[in-house]
A protein has these predicted regions:
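Conserved catalytic-core motifs of eukaryotic protein kinase domains, centered on the activation segment
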Residues: 120-121, 127-129, 173, 189-190
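A short, glycine- and basic residue-enriched loop/turn
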Residues: 136-137, 154-155, 176
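Short-chain dehydrogenase/reductase
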Residues: 162, 178-180
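Beta-rich strand-turn-strand
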Residues: 95-101, 148-161, 167-171
Length: 240
């Protein structure tokens, strides 16, 4: 489809149903999660294991065929842990898998297809066991990972830093820099004279933002009718 052909009231009903699914099926899978959890495509989010925690206003934007997976594993007496701060955005196709501990700071944005793990999962020579091939991962506040970034065990990425698309982060990245490559290297610092606005600034008035989005959707869908929506499902045209 080229556009959303649903009338506004159908969109509202669908959104309400998805919010119910989040409360009824997804929230109980977290050990703790703050208010304001928003999920696009609930069926595309998978939580596995214990010790998964998130702050307020976590946004999970899964998509059909592009699941988000948050998983912790029991590695023989040591259970992994995932701690996600406030106002974090996780995009489609992300896998965050912990054997020890992964910490994601508030306001962090993770683009599509990233992989974050605190373990190699198998020893170099004894490939039947993990042994000591694990170390905590920390993404400090307001980190931005580009598309298909891989973050390896033992890495800390400093506050505000940006990792370019396709990079492999195998060692620590300092705060307030841009890093790219495989392995990721710092290419330049951020400009200290520039103000950095964060997701928490946008979400400070959560209810007001929600009202604005509803008004925008009402405007964008204003010409859609139940008949034209049903027709677009049964007999779509080039305009649909």
């Amino acid at each position: 489809m080229r556009r959303d052909a649903r009338p506004f009231f159908i969109r509202r009903l669908r959104d309400g149903f998805e919010e119910w699914r989040v409360r009824h099926f997804l929230e109980p899978q977290f050990d703790s999660v703050g208010p304001g959890l928003k999920v696009a495509y609930v069926s595309g989010v998978e939580l596995w294991g214990a010790n998964i925690h998130a702050g307020h206003d976590l946004h999970l934007r899964a998509a059909r065929g592009n699941m988000i997976r948050l998983a912790t594993w029991d590695s023989g007496g040591r259970v992994g842990e995932i701690r996600i701060g406030d106002c974090v955005l996780i995009s489609p196709g992300n896998q965050i898998i912990s054997s020890e501990k992964i910490t994601i700071g508030s306001n962090t944005m993770i683009a599509s297809g990233c992989y974050i793990s605190d373990s190699d999962w198998h020893d170099t020579y004894d490939r039947t066991a993990e042994h000591d091939k694990h170390a905590p991962v920390v993404l400090e506040e307001n980190v931005w990972l580009g598309t298909r970034v891989i973050v390896c065990k033992g890495v800390t990425i400093g506050e505000n830093s940006i990792i370019g698309a396709g990079s492999v982060v195998a060692s620590d990245i300092p705060a307030n820099v841009i890093a790219v490559g495989s392995p990721a290297r710092v290419i330049r610092p951020l400009d200290p004279a520039q103000e950095i606005r964060k997701r928490s600034d946008m979400l400070a008035d959560r209810d007001g933002l929600q009202r604005e989005m509803q008004q925008l959707n009402r405007y964008l869908l204003r010409e859609n009718t139940l008949f034209t929506w049903l027709r677009s499902l049964i007999a779509p045209t080039r305009k649909d």
